[in-house]
């Protein structure tokens, strides 16, 4: 065991990381038991182990062991802030690991699941609220209105979205049967006990992630490293 601000890993694995990248360290993949949401500050060849590199990170020192696992977690925001274009990716980043921007929105999908406030579910039926002051979990009346269709009870790639002329922006899957190359090419998760909506997927979602990727299978009390939110306004 060694306490410090670096972890030594195989060179081919360590070279996947970059300065400024968000990382976590734990007892296994997706574990943050040792360090959560740190940033890589330096990567250099190990002087102690052949064909290995030391990946340095910010924050408090960590007790590293031979079984500790380094992995890429949610990426910090701001990578595209200097871009002049509303769309694209950071110049020179072509390895599939860079932040992207669409209509000025950074990492619209694929970095973290983004919680959609104002959309509650009860047995596949969605209830929608457009009054931010009235947002609340497990509310299906009052400021929350019943959407004019029931979501699909089968998960899979999205083939069709429901349409309610009162709330056209909701776009919840009603028919699955697409694929990663046909129809909307994004996935839909569901469960009878699902109560909230998360969108976009996260860093480990792979090909199923996308702007229309919806998770409607979580309860309102669920939390995890890969679920967050996005501010809709700034004062």
Regions picked out by a protein language model, each given a short descriptive name:
Residues 27, 41-42, 81-85, 101-102, ...:
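Short acidic-hydrophobic catalytic motif
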Residues 28, 60, 108-111, 115-120:
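An acidic- and aromatic-residue-enriched active-site/binding cleft used to recognize and process polar
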Residues 15-30, 61-85:
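Extended Gly/Ser/Thr-rich low-complexity repeat segments
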Residues 8-10, 75-109, 163:
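Short, well-ordered junction/capping motifs at the entry into regular secondary structure
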Residues 4, 20, 37, 100-112, ...:
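Extracellular structured ligand-interaction cores
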Residues 112-120, 139-235:
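C-terminal, surface-exposed recognition/capping segments
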Residues 1-56:
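Autoprocessing Asn-cyclization modules and mimics
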Residues 122-133:
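A short, polar/charged loop-to-alpha-helix boundary motif
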């Amino acid at each position: 065991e060694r306490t410090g601000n670096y972890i030594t890993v195989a060179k081919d694995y360590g070279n996947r990381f970059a300065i400024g990248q968000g990382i976590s360290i734990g007892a296994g993949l997706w574990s943050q038991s040792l360090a959560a949401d740190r940033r890589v500050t330096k990567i250099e060849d190990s002087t102690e182990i052949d064909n290995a590199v030391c990946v340095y990170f910010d924050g408090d020192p960590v007790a590293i062991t031979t079984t500790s696992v380094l992995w890429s977690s949610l990426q910090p925001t701001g990578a595209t802030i200097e871009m002049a274009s509303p769309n694209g990716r950071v110049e020179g980043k072509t390895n599939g690991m860079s932040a992207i921007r669409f209509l000025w929105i950074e990492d619209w999908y694929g970095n973290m699941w983004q919680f959609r406030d104002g959309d509650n579910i009860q047995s596949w039926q969605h209830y929608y609220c457009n009054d931010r002051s009235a947002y609340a979990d497990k509310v299906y009346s009052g400021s929350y209105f019943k959407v004019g269709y029931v979501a699909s009870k089968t998960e899979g790639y999205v083939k069709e979205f429901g349409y309610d002329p009162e709330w056209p922006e909701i776009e919840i899957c009603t028919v699955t049967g697409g694929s990663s190359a046909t129809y909307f090419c994004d996935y839909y998760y569901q469960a009878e006990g699902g109560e909230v909506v998360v969108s976009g997927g996260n860093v480990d979602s792979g090909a199923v992630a996308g702007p229309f990727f919806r998770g409607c299978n979580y309860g309102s009390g669920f939390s995890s490293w890969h679920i967050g939110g996005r501010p809709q306004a700034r004062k």
